[in-house]
Amino acid sequence: YTSLIEPLSLDEAYLDVTDSVHCHGSATLMAQEIRQTIFNELNLTASAGVAPVKFLAKIASDLNKPNGQYVITPDEVPAFLKTLPLGKIPGVGKVSAAKLESMGLRTCEDVQRSDLAMLLKRFGKFGRVLWERSQGIDDRDVNSERLRKSVGVERTLSEDIHDWSECETIITEQLYPELERRLSKVKPDLLIARQGIKLKFNDFQQTTQEHVWPRLNKDDLIATAKKAWEERRGGRGVRLVGLHVTLLDPQLERQLVLGL
């Protein structure tokens, strides 16, 4: 569909399909087709957001989860922003949203009516970003060269598991080989900063645990997973198992190499 892809996380990415000829150039139809392909090939549902700018696409992608999509056309942006809570804007956390609300700023429309100079004085660069987002402005391009910070792999299970041996088999036979393959594509030497595991339980709670580790290591991942299984599961069934690594910062890695 496009070569302009910016990964955000293990299962999320921005796509710029502005110049794509697929589906007669319709981003809505492309999103539908991609979601259907994911379901057909992986038996997994996916949500999508379609919008003229990145932050609105991100917001839209959360509106019809777990198996739907939401479209914001350019003409619909003003009406959509009018009632949009500021806390929905990526980068505006709970503390910032509470502070803004104490100033009488709850929605994008409230910010639209505010003085930019006041926002700059009170919040600095964040004030400008807030003002721009409230106007529907987001000049960031989809960056296909964005530095990857982590690599991971997960499996959602068709049935909950309750036996550690099943979890260990999934890690050793499925997840670890796939993680090693993915990591080798971006880091052939397998050097990393940290590695860890994730377990999601049948009550939708999850736990993660990781260690500082210089190189991908299967035995440590298995030991970490077993520790989390024994100490944090509490008898609950497990429906998702995941492994991940955090990559070394290139500048730090260069300093370490030079130090040697």
Task: For the regions a language model picked out, list residue spans one by one.
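DNA-contacting surface of Y-family translesion DNA polymerases
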Residues: 88, 101-240, 248-253
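Short, internal active-site loops enriched in acidic
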Residues: 19-21, 52-57, 200-204, 246-251
